[in-house]
């Protein structure tokens, strides 16, 4: 992780109905080119199809982009994503292990907010990237942000949604379980007192899952491109579409 916090400030949604509609976009693996391909799939075309389908399904309050925007640290991938998302709907971004936060990623400051605040929910963005590593961790800055968000949500009687790139639980997949948040137990220990009002969403694992761990519901979301086979010992692809 970078020494200075990448994520700062709040984005506020104060004028909407009791229903909050968030769309998670994750692991786009864009290259900055319309011709970029990952494992045989054109990543711009697949990301565009997913985003367009989400927009067509109804109004969206905010996109939550949970990392691996770039396929391999390509600096133009971030403008490419911004173009796909458009300007009509706000979006908050996290880096993944394939993103280089030292380059152009950090220049997209409007998307790098720590929290999305609404009347009934707070959304907390936590950075799990560890520079030079595939797996993730939460440093003290991120853990402190978690503790502060729990305190504020409790004081204001709000539910709390936490977004990360790396998941905070086992995926029952040997090769992926080496890449989860290595100090997840510490984070979940802090969250335990607010477990019944909390939800964690993550990316990285290129598959859908829904589990309750330590009383906390945890979701992972498919990539907008290729999917990984669930519960596999070694790297394996699934034949599911995004």
How does the language model describe each region?
Residues 118-159, 176-186:
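Binuclear metal-dependent hydrolase catalytic cores centered on His/Asp/Glu-rich metal-binding motifs
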Residues 34-36, 65-86, 100-112, 173-175, ...:
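Metal-dependent catalytic neighborhoods of phosphoester/phosphodiester hydrolases
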Residues 23-46, 71, 100-110, 131-140, ...:
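Acidic/histidine-rich helix-loop elements
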Residues 2-7, 16, 25, 190, ...:
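Binuclear metal-dependent phosphoesterase catalytic core
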């Amino acid at each position: 992780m970078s020494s200075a916090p990448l994520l700062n400030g709040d984005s506020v949604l104060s004028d909407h109905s009791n229903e909050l509609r968030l769309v998670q976009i994750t692991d786009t693996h864009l290259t900055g080119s319309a011709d970029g391909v990952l494992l045989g799939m054109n990543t711009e075309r697949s990301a565009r199809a997913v985003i367009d389908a989400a927009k067509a399904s109804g109004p969206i309050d905010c996109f939550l982009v949970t990392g691996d925007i770039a396929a391999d640290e390509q600096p133009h991938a971030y403008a490419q994503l911004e173009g796909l998302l458009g300007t009509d709907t706000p979006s908050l971004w996290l880096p993944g292990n394939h993103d280089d936060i030292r380059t152009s990623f950090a220049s997209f400051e409007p998307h790098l907010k720590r929290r999305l605040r609404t009347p009934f929910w707070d959304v907390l963005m936590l950075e799990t990237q560890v520079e030079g590593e595939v797996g993730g961790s939460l440093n003290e800055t991120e853990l402190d942000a978690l503790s502060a968000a729990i305190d504020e949500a409790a004081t204001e009687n709000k539910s709390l949604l936490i977004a990360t790139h790396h998941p905070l639980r086992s995926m029952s997949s040997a090769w992926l379980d080496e890449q989860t948040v290595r100090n997840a137990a510490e984070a979940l220990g802090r969250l335990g007192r607010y477990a019944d009002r909390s939800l964690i969403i993550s990316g990285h694992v290129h598959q859908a899952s829904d589990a309750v761990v330590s009383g906390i519901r945890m979701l992972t979301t498919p990539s907008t491109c290729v999917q990984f086979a669930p519960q596999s010992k070694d790297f394996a692809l699934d034949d599911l579409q995004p």
